[in-house]
Regions:
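Conserved PLP-enzyme active-site core in the AAT-like
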Residues: 1-199, 247, 255, 260
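Generic structural signal for hydrophobic core residues of well-folded globular domains
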Residues: 5, 167-171, 218, 274-281
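PLP-dependent enzyme catalytic core of the Aspartate aminotransferase-like
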Residues: 54-55, 184, 246-308
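Short hydrophobic/aromatic beta-strand micro-patches
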Residues: 134, 215-219, 253-255
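A common structural junction motif
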Residues: 152, 233-237, 278
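Flexible, glycine/charged-enriched surface loops at secondary-structure junctions
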Residues: 155-158, 175-181, 193-206, 240-242, ...
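Conserved small-domain helix->loop->beta segment predominantly found in fold-type I
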Residues: 168, 179, 183-249
Length: 308
């Protein structure tokens, strides 16, 4: 999208890596020669500083806002942004696309007329790996359609599109229950971990998260130790060293856990597993890990697909 909609004389505002923004965005913009500055951010609330942002939007200096958050427990509220007609938004919803589709989170396309919503299918929207581009602006649509194919992509695969459509139909039928459970489990797990002594990021609404993610805040040494111990038992986590995590911590996503339709007792077992990892208790790690592996049966999916 950036290659199709931006020129090297343009300036944009972005969510930076320290704010949870994807690390690739500054690199891409630098390669394109596009000037960028940070979107004002309130780290205490894990949220955009809308007053400062709206003041910057009034300046007329910027062509786009680019939201590209990989670490996100409190999504931006697009309805609070006062955007002049001369500006647009590129909203990378890769992490939350499934939550948006199910109505768990607000759909950015419904609040501002000149916006491009992009995302990948490997997070909360389970589907064959691919990207999706949506816009409510005919001008952006024409630029994207003209530039992306054939300038950047020439290998459209019909079988890939068919598989994506089946996955989207699956979410249309089963996604609302699945996506709501994803956020519910994230908050349940955060609460259980908090009771076990973990320092979990918490929002002022008394929730831990509005998404599938929760943040465990640790110092750098403990973060690296926790991550490595988990990896030793083939347990995948994301370690972070950035200001959003008070400098260091672990990010956990619950989208795959929710896909197994785990109940509260299963979530409590998962919390105990993470507690055992923290304390290097090999006996408990193996016990809870093996019990949870037996519960990994996919749900929220069609048992049979017949094409007539």
């Amino acid at each position: 999208c950036a290659m199709s909609l931006l020129k090297n004389t343009d300036s944009v505002l972005i969510t930076t890596p320290d704010q949870g923004g994807h690390a690739s965005i500054p690199i891409i913009l630098e390669k394109l020669g596009v000037n960028y500055e940070s979107i004002p951010y309130d780290y205490d609330n894990y949220q955009i500083d809308y007053k400062e942002l709206n003041d910057l939007c009034k300046s007329g200096l910027y062509k786009f806002l680019i939201f590209c958050q990989s670490d996100i427990i409190n999504p931006p509220d697009i309805s609070k942004i006062s955007l002049p007609d001369s500006m647009g938004i590129i909203y990378d919803g890769t992490q939350t696309l499934g939550l948006i589709a199910a109505g768990v989170l607000k759909n950015p396309l419904e609040y501002i007329n000149n916006i491009v919503l992009i995302g990948g299918t490997h997070k909360t929207l389970p589907a064959p790996a691919c990207g999706l581009i949506m816009t409510n602006c005919s001008n952006y649509q024409q630029q994207l359609q003209k530039n992306i194919t054939p300038n950047y992509l020439r290998n459209t695969q019909p079988n890939h599109i068919a598989a994506l459509l089946l996955a989207l139909i699956e979410q249309e039928n089963l996604g609302k229950s699945y996506q709501n459970l994803t956020v519910k489990i994230a908050n349940q797990l955060a609460e259980e971990l908090s009771e076990l002594g973990f320092n979990i990021a918490k929002l002022k609404s008394n929730k831990y998260t509005y998404t599938h993610q929760l943040f465990i805040l640790m110092n750098s040494l403990d973060t690296n130790d926790f991550y490595q111990t988990a990896e030793n038992y083939n347990i995948t986590l994301n370690k972070k060293h950035k200001r959003l995590f008070a400098n260091d911590g672990i990010r956990i996503g619950t989208q795959e856990i929710a896909r197994y339709n785990w109940n509260f007792s299963n979530v409590k077992m998962l919390a105990q597993l993470l507690y055992a990892i923290k304390n290097h208790n090999e006996k408990d790690i193996l016990y809870y890990r093996n019990k949870l592996i037996l519960l990994k049966t996919p749900a929220f999916t069609f048992e049979d697909i017949s094409i007539k």
